[in-house]
Amino acid sequence: MLRHSPSLWELVEEHVPLRERREVKRILGEAAVDLSLELRAEVAMLRALLQEARSSQAPSSRPISDPSSLLAPPPLLKDLLRQELRQLLQGLRHKAICEGRDQAQAWVQYSPRVLHFALEEPRCDLPEQEIFQMRGGGPSSGHRDLSIIKDQLNVSNIDQVARHLRGLLEEECHTLEREILILQRCLEEEYLRPCHPSEAALEPTLAELKEQKKAMEQELQASVGPSCVSPNHRQRPLGSSTQGLRPPLPLCGVAPLQCCLPAPPLEPYLRPRGQSATHRWGRQLQCSPREGPASTPMSSAAPQAPA
C-alpha cells in the first residue's frame, strides 16, 4: 500500500494557529476543503474494501500441515515466474510443432494449476504503481510549496498565498478523483472474478512453480526429433557410422562374385596345396590378371574336400 500522504488542509493546520484555522479555511474555500477531505476518506474506504476482498480470496484454505502452503510467492516474484513460464510454454508448443506432434498435447503433462497461473491475465494487484505514476513518482508538490510559504500561513498574510493554495487544493481534488476511479475499477474486477469454493486451491505454491519450471526447461533442453534436424546434420552421423561397414572395392582381376566368398571358418577346406598353402585367406585373393581366373583354386579344391 502507498503511504498515507497528508492532505493539503492537514499541512495547513500544522502551520496555522488553532484560533485562525476557521478564517483561513473560509478564505481558501470551505467547499473545496471539505471536498478534498471527503475524497480522501473515500480513497481510504476503497483501499480497505479492496484489501479485504483480496484477503478473503487468498489461498488460506490449504492445510497448515502442508509446508509448501507457507511458501506463497510475493507479487513481484509471481509476475516474474508468470513471464518465464509463458516463455517456456511457448517454446514447448513450438517444439511440438517442429516435431510434428499435436501442439495441444505439449502441455498435458504439467500441473493444471501451474498452467492456469501462467496463462491467466495478471489481475490488478493493489494499484500502487499506477497511482504512483499518476502522482508523478515523487513527494507531493503541495508539501514542497508549503515548506516555502509556511511563514505566510496566518490570517495577516494568507491573502498573499491564497490563490496559490486554492490551485494546490484543486489539483489535489483532481488527483483523488482519478485515484478513486482506479480503485473502483480494481474492486469491480475483484468481485467479477469467478469465485468457486476451490478457487483458493488453484493458486500454486512457490515450490510447485519452481518444480514445474525446471521440468519445462529440461524438456526443452532434451534432444529434438528428426524432423527438427537439418538434412546435413542427419547425413553426417550416417556416413561416419557406415564408413567401416562399406564393402571393399573389387580387386584387380577378381570376379565380382568373389566379394561374397564364405567366411574364413571354411579355410581348411579351401586351402590349396604346395607353396601357396602357407598364404592366408586374404592374401590368396591378391592375384594379378595374368594368373587367370580366381575361381580355379576353388574348383580344384572342391572335389578334394571329401578325401
Swiss-Prot record:
<protein>
    <recommendedName>
        <fullName>Coiled-coil domain-containing protein 24</fullName>
    </recommendedName>
</protein>
<feature type="region of interest" description="Disordered">
    <location>
        <begin position="271"/>
        <end position="307"/>
    </location>
</feature>
<dbReference type="GO" id="GO:0001835">
    <property type="term" value="P:blastocyst hatching"/>
</dbReference>
<keyword id="KW-0175">Coiled coil</keyword>
<dbReference type="InterPro" id="IPR031367">
    <property type="entry name" value="CCDC24"/>
</dbReference>
<feature type="compositionally biased region" description="Polar residues">
    <location>
        <begin position="296"/>
        <end position="307"/>
    </location>
</feature>
<dbReference type="Pfam" id="PF15669">
    <property type="entry name" value="CCDC24"/>
</dbReference>
<feature type="coiled-coil region">
    <location>
        <begin position="168"/>
        <end position="225"/>
    </location>
</feature>
<feature type="region of interest" description="Disordered">
    <location>
        <begin position="223"/>
        <end position="245"/>
    </location>
</feature>
